[in-house]
Structure formats: structure tokens, C-alpha cells
């Protein structure tokens, strides 16, 4: 299991938080995703044998947010 914190721009409300967390947890291999609106990031616990950083970044960007 691995943990990464991904910087995300454009999140400002609970809808944003829910959209990003849901997009990530729907990926096979992601166990948890915890968005911090204040910090502008999401902490993700995942199995790096099943999911990659580019896949997670794509899932976030598909929701309309920018990944740094």
C-alpha cells in the first residue's frame, strides 16, 4: 500500500470534494481518498500494483480540476 498527496486546483466546495473523492475511490486499487479544500490537495491510499499516479491524475482531471 502506498500513500500520495496530490495538489489539485479548482476545488472550492463540498461538491468538488465529493467529485474528486468519488472519482478516485472508483479506481481499482484506491482504498481511500481524503480531500482537504483548505490545503487544495487530496491524500490517496492505494495499491501501486493496481493503479498508477497518471491514472489517478486523469481521474481528477476528468472531473474538471487541474493537477499540479
UniProtKB/Swiss-Prot annotation:
Coiled-coil boundaries: none
Keyword Cell division attached: no
Record PROSITE patterns: HMA_1, HMA_2
Single GO term (MF): copper ion binding
This protein's UniProt keywords: Chaperone, Copper, Cytoplasm, Metal-binding
Keyword Chaperone: yes
Family annotation (SUPFAM superfamilies): HMA, heavy metal-associated domain (SSF55008)
Residues that coordinate or bind Cu cation: 13, 16
Chief place of localization: cytoplasm
Gene3D superfamilies in UniProt: 3.30.70.100
InterPro entries assigned to the protein according to its UniProt record, in alphabetical order: CopZ (IPR049740), Heavy-metal-associated_CS (IPR017969), HMA_Cu_ion-bd (IPR006122), HMA_dom (IPR006121), HMA_dom_sf (IPR036163), MerP/CopZ (IPR001802)
Database matches in Pfam families: HMA (PF00403)
GO cellular component term, pick one: cytoplasm
Domain HMA: 2-68
PANTHER family: P-TYPE CATION-TRANSPORTING ATPASE
Full protein name: Copper chaperone CopZ
UniProt source species: Staphylococcus saprophyticus subsp. saprophyticus (strain ATCC 15305 / DSM 20229 / NCIMB 8711 / NCTC 7292 / S-41)
Amino acid at each position: 500500500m502506498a500513500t500520495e498527496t496530490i495538489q489539485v486546483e479548482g476545488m472550492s466546495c463540498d461538491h468538488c470534494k465529493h467529485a474528486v473523492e468519488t472519482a478516485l475511490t472508483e479506481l481499482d486499487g484506491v482504498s481511500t481518498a481524503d480531500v482537504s479544500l483548505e490545503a487544495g490537495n487530496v491524500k490517496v491510499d492505494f495499491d501501486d500494483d493496481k493503479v498508477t499516479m497518471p491514472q489517478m491524475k486523469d481521474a481528477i482531471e476528468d472531473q474538471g480540476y487541474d493537477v499540479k
